[in-house]
């Protein structure tokens, strides 16, 4: 049947990791010697952190180093307690007005507090303006200060004009500043301009910062060695998780049964790794990666395989949540396979959630997938009718078709201690942080994949809808959508500030998923074009850091 049907197949780039099981070989770094050294260094780093409390500003800088080197998770409770105490008891706005508190320092203080949900006033940057309300010209001679200002400005929320000005000011000068900086600082500036720390994938940022920190005069050898060993030990765990997912994929015979989808095991794992890298989330990464593989197959099935009649039958079955697709339903075997594997996967998770005492969570998990499928179905209907939706119609459906509701819900599954039924109910209520993440996901993807999707029959994107409704150029539509994404980041930043409605670890999943989108889709669709992610995958999963 399938060979007689005219299908909207996409010419997806081939998978570049033929066998992750052999590509990502095990290392011998998981020895007791390294683990013992790691434990000893951890105590030394903790002692240094505790000693830094005597100087509040140096303490903040130490926290910044811990975060950027990827080891702050070891001391998270101590860090939050210290920041909480400092924020409540110390007058940081007054402290930063002191003459010795330079732009570099103020930028770090601002970043660290906001990173942990403390909304330090943006007025701390007023001291760097002249009598005309402009940032002082001499600041451009301070490379570290300008970079710190740029990174701090990524944490802006709505109504903070000085942060908008700081971002424009720092960004406009950093390219030139990098040309006259030392080689390692120039690389750091260029990396930041491409992907700011706040919008980067944590593991990628850590790997880059370790190389940078090693060249700094202020480098703490103990902290550096601890960060290197910690990275390498975690890398072993991450490789084992990828191997687990790969075995599952092979055992399901996924590649032979669904030939038209993007087979992106390694890239899907990187997506999960960007969502949470810490060891306690090992099972969560495995489950989320499996889900991403299923989501990819669903997306490609709706977008680049199924006919309208087949997709309607598939969607109806999912809405009813049939345990399997009956033989009499006339859809291709590959679509039946996707359906049956997906429903079985979700039903198994539902059973596990029930056993854990989290009754009802599975209902919301399934509902998130059903809504995503209906979002895909709506796009298929628009394509069939050759209908260009209004921008508002598109935006409403795009929140569903982004798939980020289903993905965020999936990241909650293995967060047993904090993701109870109320968390899933809250997520289903369209909280602002979820909507912001969905907008970032859908519109960033639209902008980056516009050219590829217009090479074949494809539903009108947000860019097309905006151009049609308002009679503007593609360039203007892209600019508007970019502004919408920027506003969504401000919404997301605001929702991360205290007081929190739900535990901060849950909010961090939403933030980290948005960060993955920025890395995967800001410039091109790197998930579809895996060569664009190869360098990151090699640095995170293949190459160990020399000790």
Swiss-Prot record:
A motif (DDXXD motif) lies at residues 299-303. GO terms for biological process: diterpenoid biosynthetic process; response to herbivore; sesquiterpene biosynthetic process; sesquiterpenoid biosynthetic process. GO terms for cellular component: cytoplasm. Expressed exclusively in flowers. Expressed in the flower stigmata and also detected in the mesocarp cell layers of the silique wall. It catalyses: (2E,6E)-farnesyl diphosphate = (-)-(E)-beta-caryophyllene + diphosphate; (2E,6E)-farnesyl diphosphate = alpha-copaene + diphosphate; (2E,6E)-farnesyl diphosphate = alpha-humulene + diphosphate; (2E,6E)-farnesyl diphosphate = (1S,2S,4R)-beta-elemene + diphosphate. GO terms for molecular function: (-)-E-beta-caryophyllene synthase activity; alpha-humulene synthase activity; magnesium ion binding. Gene3D superfamilies: Farnesyl Diphosphate Synthase, Terpene synthase, N-terminal domain. Keywords: Cytoplasm, Lyase, Magnesium, Manganese, Metal-binding. Disruption phenotype: Does not emit (E)-beta-caryophyllene, alpha-copaene and alpha-humulene. Induction: Induced in response to the caterpillar P.xylostella feeding. Mg(2+) 3 binds at residues 445-446, 449, 453. It is an enzyme of class 4 (lyase). Mg(2+) 2 binds at residues 299, 303. The keyword Flavoprotein does not apply. SUPFAM superfamilies: Terpenoid cyclases/Protein prenyltransferases, Terpenoid synthases. Its EC number is 4.2.3.-, 4.2.3.57, 4.2.3.133, 4.2.3.104. The Asp-Asp-Xaa-Xaa-Asp/Glu (DDXXD/E) motif is important for the catalytic activity, presumably through binding to Mg(2+). Belongs to the terpene synthase family. Tpsa subfamily. This is Alpha-humulene/(-)-(E)-beta-caryophyllene synthase.
């Amino acid at each position: 049947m399938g060979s007689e049907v005219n299908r909207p197949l996409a010419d997806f780039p081939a998978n570049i990791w033929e066998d992750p099981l052999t590509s990502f070989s095990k290392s011998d770094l998981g020895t007791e010697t390294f683990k013992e050294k790691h434990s000893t260094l951890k105590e030394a780093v903790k002692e240094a952190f505790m000693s830094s409390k005597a100087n509040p500003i140096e303490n903040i800088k130490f926290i910044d180093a811990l975060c950027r080197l990827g080891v702050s998770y070891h001391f998270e409770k101590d860090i939050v307690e210290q920041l909480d105490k400092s924020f409540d008891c110390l007058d940081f706005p007054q402290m930063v007005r002191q003459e010795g508190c330079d732009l570099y320092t103020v930028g770090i203080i601002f970043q660290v507090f906001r990173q942990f949900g403390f909304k330090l006033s943006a007025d701390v940057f007023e001291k760097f303006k002249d009598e005309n309300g402009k940032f002082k010209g001499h600041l451009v001679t301070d490379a570290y200060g300008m970079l710190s200002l740029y990174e701090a400005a990524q944490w802006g929320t709505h109504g903070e004009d000085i942060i908008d000005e700081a971002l424009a000011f720092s960004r406009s000068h950093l390219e030139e500043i990098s040309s006259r900086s030392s080689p390692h600082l120039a690389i750091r500036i260029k990396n930041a301009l491409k992907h700011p720390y706040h919008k980067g994938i944590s593991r990628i940022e850590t790997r880059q910062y370790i190389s940078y920190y090693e060249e700094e005069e202020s480098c703490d050898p103990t902290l550096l060695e601890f960060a290197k060993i910690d990275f390498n030990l975690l890398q072993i765990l991450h490789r084992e998780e990828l191997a687990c997912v790969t075995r599952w994929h092979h055992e399901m015979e996924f590649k032979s049964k669904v030939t038209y989808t993007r087979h992106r095991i390694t890239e899907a794992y990187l997506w999960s790794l960007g969502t949470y890298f810490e060891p306690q989330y090992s099972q969560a990464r495995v489950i989320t990666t499996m889900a991403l593989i299923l989501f990819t197959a669903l997306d490609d099935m709706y977008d680049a395989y199924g006919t309208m009649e087949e997709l309607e039958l598939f969607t109806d079955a999912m809405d009813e949540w049939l345990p399997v697709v009956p033989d009499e339903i006339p859809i291709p075997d590959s679509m039946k396979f996707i359906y049956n594997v997906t429903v079985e996967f979700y039903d198994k998770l539902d059973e596990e959630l029930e056993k854990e005492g989290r009754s009802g969570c599975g209902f919301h998990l399934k509902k998130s997938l059903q809504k995503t499928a209906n979002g895909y179905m709506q796009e298929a209907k628009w394509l069939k009718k050759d209908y260009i939706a209004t921008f508002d119609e598109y935006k409403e459906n795009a929140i569903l078709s982004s798939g980020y509701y289903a993905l965020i819900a999936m990241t909650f599954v293995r967060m047993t201690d904090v993701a109870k039924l109320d968390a899933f109910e809250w997520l289903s209520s369209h909280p602002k942080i979820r909507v912001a993440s969905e907008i970032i996901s859908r519109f960033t993807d639209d902008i980056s994949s516009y050219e590829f999707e217009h090479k074949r029959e494809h539903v009108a994107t947000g860019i097309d809808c905006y151009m049609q409704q308002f009679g503007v150029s593609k360039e203007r539509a892209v600019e508007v959508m970019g502004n919408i994404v920027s506003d969504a980041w401000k919404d997301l930043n605001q929702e991360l500030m205290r007081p929190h409605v739900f535990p901060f670890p849950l909010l961090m999943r939403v933030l980290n998923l948005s960060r993955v989108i920025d890395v995967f889709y800001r410039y091109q669709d790197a998930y579809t074009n895996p060569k664009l992610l190869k360098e990151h995958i090699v640095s995170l999963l293949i190459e160990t850091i020399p000790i």
